[in-house]
Amino acid sequence: MIALIQRVKSASVQVDAEIVGKIDSGLLVFLGVEQQDNIEAMEKLATKVISYRIFNDENGKMNLSLKQAGGALLCVSQFTLAADTGRGLRPSFSKAATPEQANHLYEAFIDYCRLQGVETQIGRFGADMQVSLINDGPVTFNLQV
C-alpha cells in the first residue's frame, strides 16, 4: 500500500465541478492499493500517515504529527501509484489491486483515520477528479508498507 502525502495549507477535490472534499491545514494523501495489500497493511500505513512527524513545532523543527498539529486529512484514491515504471515508456498497472479490493481498503483507511480522531475528507473513488492544493514547504513523502 502506498501513500503519497503532502503537507498543505489547504486542499480540495472536485468531481463534475462540485467540491466533494476540502481541508485547511493538514495532509493531502494520495492512496494507492496493490494486489497483495490487506487490512493489516492498511492499518499500518494509516497509523504511519497520521503519526508521521512532519509538522513544525514551536522551534520550527519537524516534530509534530498530524494529530498533534491539529490538522485535517484529505484522502484521494490514486491507482497510478501502483504503476510499474521500470520498463519501457508506458506504465504497467499489473500490480494494482482490483477496483473492488482497492475501494474496500480505501474506505477502510478513511474509517480508520476517522476512528483515530482525525478530521478526514475524501475524494470520490474511481471518479475523474480535479485536485487543488497549496503546498506547505513543500513537504512531500512517499510512504509504503
From Swiss-Prot:
Organism the protein comes from: Shewanella denitrificans (strain OS217 / ATCC BAA-1090 / DSM 15013)
Motif Gly-cisPro motif, important for rejection of L-amino acids: positions: 137-138
Assembly description: Homodimer.
Keywords in alphabetical order: Cytoplasm, Hydrolase, RNA-binding, tRNA-binding
EC top class, as a word: hydrolase
Catalysis performed (reactions): glycyl-tRNA(Ala) + H2O = tRNA(Ala) + glycine + H(+); a D-aminoacyl-tRNA + H2O = a tRNA + a D-alpha-amino acid + H(+)
InterPro entries xrefs: Daa-tRNA_deacyls_DTD (IPR003732), DTD-like_sf (IPR023509)
One GO molecular-function entry: D-tyrosyl-tRNA(Tyr) deacylase activity
Top-rank taxon, per record: Bacteria
Compartments reported by the entry: Cytoplasm
GO terms, biological process: D-amino acid catabolic process
Pfam family, one: Tyr_Deacylase
Role this protein plays: An aminoacyl-tRNA editing enzyme that deacylates mischarged D-aminoacyl-tRNAs. Also deacylates mischarged glycyl-tRNA(Ala), protecting cells against glycine mischarging by AlaRS. Acts via tRNA-based rather than protein-based catalysis; rejects L-amino acids rather than detecting D-amino acids in the active site. By recycling D-aminoacyl-tRNA to D-amino acids and free tRNA molecules, this enzyme counteracts the toxicity associated with the formation of D-aminoacyl-tRNA entities in vivo and helps enforce protein L-homochirality.
Protein name, as recorded: D-aminoacyl-tRNA deacylase
